[in-house]
C-alpha cells in the first residue's frame, strides 16, 4: 500500500502545471492540474460598469480577435465556465501595477488599478499564443514589478523615426509591460562628417513650431496634433511618453535657426549661456509646448536635456548649473516633473540645482556619480552607457546589446560599476537607448527595430522581475521565439515559424498585390525574368517602407531604396535577356545573384572623410518589399520567397 501511495503521490505532483512562460517572467505562480480552453461562446465578463474596466475589456477583446480570429463578447452579469472575468478590487500587496489571475474552468482576473488589469491581459494573450488551442494552464498568478519605471529612449533627432513606427513601438512596449518611452526630439551630427563646418552639419528639430517657423526639420517632423494624439494613444496603452528637448548642448538645430545664440567658444552645437537672448529663445520654445489647457506635451514629465555641455571653465560650469536649475523650475511652473541627463559631477560647482522631485538619467558615472546624486536628492533612471547604449555600426558602444550578460547580471540597481540595493527607493527603474550618432550611415528604421526588439524583451524581464529570474537565458531565448511583437504588429516582417518556402507565384502581373507587405531578415527572393525596355524608375515591388527597382531612377540599374537611401547593383536586365534572379538579405548585407553567380554582395561599406582621417560604416540592408508589383514591361515568373538565406541554410 505504501508503494502504491508513493507512486500515486508522485504522479499527482507531476501533473501540477509548472510556471508558464511569459515575458516578463511571472513573480508568483501556484500550479494546479489541467488547462482552461475558451469555448466558441467565451465572453469577457465585467463585474462593474467602471469605464476603465469596460475599456480594457474591449481592448482585450479586440486584441484577442486580431491575434486569434475569435470574437469574445464583452458582457456584464454572472460568469459561466469558459468565460474571462475582469474586476477591479483592492489588494495593497499588488501595488500600482500588479494583478492576480486565477485560472480554473474560467479565468478570474483582478487588479487594484486599471494599469494592473491591462498588464494582466498582456499576460493572457502571451499565454494563449503559445499553443494552437489557446489554452491556459490552470493555477494562480500574482504578478507585480520590482521597478515602477521600465523604459526605452529613442533618438529621433539625428534620424527621423516615422510616427507609424512610434505608434507600433508603444504597442510593443505595452505587450512586454514596458511603460516609459523617452523621445529625443532634437540633435545633430558630428561636424567631422560635414567638412568640419557647423553650418553644413546636419541638425534637426522634429516638432512643428509656430513660435519659430522654420525651426522644424524639413526631412521629417511631427505636427502638434499627431504628437498629441500619439501621447494619448500611449496613455491608453499605459505607456508614458517623456518628450525631450535637449539643451544647452546638442542644440545645433536651434543655432542654425538663430545663430546669435550659438557659442563661439565651445561650438555652435552649444548654446551661449552668457546671452540673455538664449534664455528668451528657449523659454519661448518650451512654453509653446507646455502652456494652455491642452498642451502639446501631454504627460506628467518633460525632459530638458542638459547632456554633455563643456566644463572647460568654472564660469561656464556655474552658468550651466544655473541654466539647469532655471529650466527645471520653468517646466515645473507648468505642472510638469523635470527630467535631466546626469551631468552635475562633470559640472561640479557652487550654484545650487534643484533636486527635490527631479528625475535624472544616470548614464555615465563620470558625469553624474549615482551615489552622490542620490544623496543630493535626485530620483534616478538607470541607463548605464557601457551596458545599454546602442549606436548602430558606430564602432563604439554596442551595435547589438550583450543580452546574455544583461539577463544574467544586470538590473537597474547596477549603474556602471556602482551597485545599489535592489528596489532602492531612489532608483525609479531602468531604460536602454538607441543613439543615431552617425547621420548618413544607411541605417534604416527596420535596422533600428532589429537592434531593439530583442533587448526590449530581455530588459523587460530585468526591470519587472529584477534579479529573481527563474529560468536560464538559453531557455528564455528559445521560448520567446513563440511570442509576437504585439497584437497586429510585425515590424520585423517575420513570415512563418520554421525555415521554409513561405510564398510563391507562377506569374507576377504588373500592379498586382501579394499576401505579405514585406519579408524581414533572413530571406531569399528569387524569380525568373525575361527583360523588356524599362524606363528609369521602374519598380519591381514596393511596400510602405521600401522599393525594389528593376531600373533605378538615376542610372537604370537594379537596386532598392529605403529611408531616403538609394543602393544600386552593377547589373540591369537588358531587353530580351532571360535570367534567374536571387536576392538574399540579412541584417548585415543584401546579395544579388544572377543565374547562380554572385553579382554583388552589399555588405557594410567604409566611407572616408577628411583625407582618410575619419570614417563611417555605411549599411546597405533591405527588408524586401512585396506588397505591390510595379508597372513593368518585363515578364516576371516563378516568384519564390523563403524565410531564410538559401545559400546559408
Regions found by a protein language model. Name each.
Residues 157, 186-190, 246-250, 307-309, ...:
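Active-site beta-loop-alpha junctions enriched in small/polar residues
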Residues 93-270, 277, 283-301, 436:
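Feature activates predominantly on carbohydrate-active enzymes
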Residues 150-154, 181-183, 241-245, 300-304, ...:
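Hydrophobic faces of well-ordered beta-strands that scaffold small-molecule active sites
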Residues 44, 64, 113, 152, ...:
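Conserved, mostly hydrophobic/aromatic
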Residues 254-359, 363-379:
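Active-site neighborhood of glycoside hydrolase catalytic domains
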Residues 4, 12-145, 338-347, 354, ...:
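Acidic, contiguous N-terminal accessory segments
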Residues 495-649:
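Extracellular glycan-associated modules
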Residues 352-358, 365-505:
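Flexible, acidic glycine-rich loops studded with aromatic residues
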Amino acid at each position: 500500500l505504501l508503494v502504491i501511495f508513493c507512486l500515486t503521490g508522485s504522479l499527482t505532483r507531476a501533473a501540477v502545471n509548472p510556471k508558464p512562460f511569459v515575458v516578463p517572467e511571472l513573480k508568483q505562480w501556484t500550479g494546479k492540474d489541467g488547462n482552461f480552453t475558451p469555448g466558441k461562446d467565451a465572453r469577457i465578463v465585467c463585474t462593474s460598469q467602471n469605464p476603465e474596466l469596460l475599456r480594457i475589456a474591449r481592448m482585450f477583446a479586440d486584441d484577442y480577435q486580431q491575434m486569434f480570429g475569435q470574437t469574445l463578447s464583452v458582457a456584464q452579469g454572472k460568469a459561466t465556465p469558459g468565460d474571462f472575468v475582469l474586476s477591479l478590487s483592492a489588494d495593497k500587496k499588488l501595488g500600482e501595477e500588479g494583478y492576480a489571475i486565477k485560472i480554473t474552468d474560467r479565468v478570474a482576473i483582478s487588479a487594484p488599478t486599471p494599469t494592473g488589469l491591462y498588464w494582466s491581459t498582456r499576460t493572457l494573450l502571451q499565454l494563449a499564443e503559445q499553443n494552437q488551442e489557446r489554452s491556459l494552464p490552470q493555477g494562480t498568478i500574482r504578478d507585480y514589478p520590482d521597478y515602477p519605471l521600465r523604459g526605452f529612449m529613442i533618438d529621433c533627432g539625428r534620424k527621423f523615426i516615422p510616427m507609424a513606427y512610434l505608434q507600433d513601438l508603444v504597442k510593443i512596449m505595452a505587450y512586454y509591460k514596458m511603460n516609459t518611452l523617452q523621445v529625443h526630439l532634437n540633435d545633430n551630427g558630428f561636424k567631422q562628417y560635414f567638412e568640419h563646418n557647423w553650418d553644413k552639419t546636419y541638425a534637426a528639430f522634429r516638432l512643428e513650431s509656430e513660435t519659430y517657423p522654420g525651426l522644424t526639420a524639413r526631412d521629417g517632423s511631427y505636427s502638434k496634433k499627431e504628437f498629441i494624439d500619439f501621447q494619448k494613444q500611449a496613455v491608453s496603452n499605459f505607456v508614458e511618453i517623456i518628450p525631450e528637448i535637449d539643451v544647452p548642448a546638442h542644440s545645433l538645430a536651434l543655432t542654425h535657426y538663430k545663430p546669435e545664440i550659438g557659442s563661439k567658444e565651445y561650438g555652435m552645437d552649444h548654446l551661449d549661456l552668457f546671452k540673455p537672448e538664449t534664455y528668451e529663445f528657449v523659454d519661448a520654445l518650451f512654453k509653446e509646448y507646455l502652456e494652455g489647457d491642452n498642451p502639446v506635451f501631454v504627460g506628467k514629465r518633460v525632459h530638458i536635456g542638459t547632456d554633455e555641455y563643456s566644463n572647460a571653465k568654472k564660469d561656464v560650469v556655474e552658468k550651466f548649473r544655473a541654466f539647469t536649475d532655471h529650466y527645471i523650475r520653468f517646466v515645473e511652473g507648468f505642472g510638469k516633473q523635470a527630467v535631466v541627463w546626469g551631468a552635475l559631477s562633470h559640472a561640479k560647482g557652487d550654484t545650487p540645482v534643484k533636486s527635490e522631485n527631479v528625475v535624472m538619467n544616470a548614464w555615465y558615472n563620470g558625469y553624474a556619480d549615482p551615489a552622490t546624486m542620490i544623496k543630493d536628492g535626485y530620483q534616478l533612471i538607470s541607463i548605464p552607457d557601457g551596458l545599454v547604449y546602442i549606436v548602430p555600426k558606430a564602432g563604439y558602444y554596442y551595435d547589438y546589446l550583450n543580452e546574455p550578460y544583461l539577463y544574467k547580471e544586470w538590473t537597474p540597481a547596477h549603474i556602471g560599476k556602482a551597485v545599489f540595493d535592489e528596489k532602492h527607493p531612489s532608483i525609479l527603474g531602468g531604460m536602454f537607448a538607441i543613439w543615431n550618432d552617425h547621420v548618413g550611415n544607411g541605417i534604416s528604421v527596420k535596422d533600428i527595430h532589429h537592434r531593439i526588439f530583442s533587448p526590449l524583451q530581455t530588459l523587460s524581464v530585468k526591470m519587472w522581475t529584477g534579479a529573481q529570474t527563474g529560468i536560464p537565458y538559453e531557455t528564455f531565448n528559445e521560448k520567446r521565439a513563440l511570442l509576437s511583437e504585439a497584437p497586429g504588429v510585425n515590424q520585423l516582417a517575420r513570415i512563418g515559424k520554421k525555415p521554409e518556402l513561405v510564398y510563391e507565384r507562377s506569374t507576377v502581373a504588373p500592379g498586382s498585390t501579394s499576401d505579405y507587405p514585406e519579408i524581414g531578415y533572413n530571406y531569399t527572393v528569387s524569380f525568373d525574368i525575361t527583360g523588356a525596355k524599362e524606363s528609369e524608375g521602374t519598380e519591381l515591388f514596393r511596400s510602405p517602407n521600401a522599393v525594389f527597382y528593376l531600373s533605378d531612377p538615376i542610372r537604370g540599374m537594379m537596386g532598392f531604396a529605403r529611408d531616403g537611401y538609394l543602393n544600386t547593383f552593377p547589373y540591369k536586365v537588358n531587353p530580351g535577356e532571360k535570367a534567374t534572379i536571387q536576392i538574399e538579405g540579412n541584417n548585415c548585407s543584401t546579395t544579388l545573384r544572377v543565374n547562380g553567380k554572385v553579382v554583388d554582395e552589399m555588405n557594410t561599406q567604409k566611407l572616408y572623410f577628411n583625407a582618410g582621417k575619419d570614417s563611417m560604416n555605411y549599411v546597405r540592408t533591405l527588408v524586401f518589399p512585396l506588397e505591390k508589383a510595379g508597372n513593368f514591361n518585363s515578364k516576371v515568373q516563378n516568384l519564390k520567397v523563403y524565410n531564410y538565406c538559401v545559400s546559408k541554410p
